[in-house]
Amino acid sequence: MASACASSTIAAVAFSSPSSRRNGSIVGTTKASFLGGRRLRVSKYSTTPTARSATTVCVAADPDRPLWFPGSTPPPWLDGSLPGDFGFDPLGLASDPESLRWNQQAELVHCRWAMLGAAGIFIPELLTKIGILNTPSWYTAGEQEYFTDTTTLFIVELVLIGWAEGRRWADIIKPGCVNTDPIFPNNKLTGTDVGYPGGLWFDPLGWGSGSPAKIKELRTKEIKNGRLAMLAVMGAWFQHIYTGTGPIDNLFAHLADPGHATIFAAFSPK
């Protein structure tokens, strides 16, 4: 659930113009209006402590930019430059540049884990349902017997994921510091963005190369599919709690009896 909450707050870069940096000005803004336009309070501070002026301006959204609610005005720190930015940040959680940078990467990795998780839930259950596989429910997979005990599996998983996550964290703190292959040092990556390592291991088909418009389109699709996957995993979890069966079994039951096998049946008295 935390990943779903995080996905709704990530969007773009902080509001900063070259002129404001050149004049040493600090731009303070009010919270974004949840729906419509708003007025922003802009305070400019000069390099001398005695010279101070304040002005009020109106910020208009780009009419061609897709927004989460048509006609709404996005907050200034969401300028549409990041993939999946539709101007949605009613709580202002992305207003701080450092928080935005961290939350952007947090959403990205949660999206990817959720897509893997959704595939691990739906595909084996569907193949088991039609008789191709014979796998346990995802909800009880941790109770099964494996080639070793679960404690050993957990420790091995913790070490491997900890190493990978440590390198990812280092790349966030200092971009480009992990672009050299730790096993084959002659293999180096250049021109990559944080969160998108590319190369043979992470982009074997070369989809991450091309025009900026194409790259942003693919990254936006990844974010949108990841957000949907986070909702799907959360939905499958709640579904199993209330029905005791998986999503594919629930789907087949609904198709067999659409008038009675619905979401409301879980809350109706037996």
Swiss-Prot record:
Sites where the protein binds chlorophyll a 2: 110
One GO MF term attached to the UniProt entry: chlorophyll binding
Chain sites annotated for binding chlorophyll b 1: 68
Binding site for chlorophyll a 1: 88, 107, 227
Stretches that traverse the bilayer: 113-133, 146-166, 228-248
Binding, chlorophyll a 3: 144, 222
Binding annotation for chlorophyll a 6: 254
Keywords for the protein's UniProt record, in alphabetical order: Chlorophyll, Chloroplast, Chromophore, Magnesium, Membrane, Metal-binding, Phosphoprotein, Photosynthesis, Photosystem I, Photosystem II, Plastid, Thylakoid, Transit peptide, Transmembrane, Transmembrane helix
Textual note on the cofactor: Binds at least 14 chlorophylls (8 Chl-a and 6 Chl-b) and carotenoids such as lutein and neoxanthin.
Entry function: The light-harvesting complex (LHC) functions as a light receptor, it captures and delivers excitation energy to photosystems with which it is closely associated.
Domain comment as written in the entry: The N-terminus of the protein extends into the stroma where it is involved with adhesion of granal membranes and post-translational modifications; both are believed to mediate the distribution of excitation energy between photosystems I and II.
Subunit-level organization: The LHC complex consists of chlorophyll a-b binding proteins.
Family classification: Belongs to the light-harvesting chlorophyll a/b-binding (LHC) protein family.
Protein name: Chlorophyll a-b binding protein 7, chloroplastic
The organism's taxonomic lineage, starting at the top: Eukaryota, Viridiplantae, Streptophyta, Embryophyta, Tracheophyta
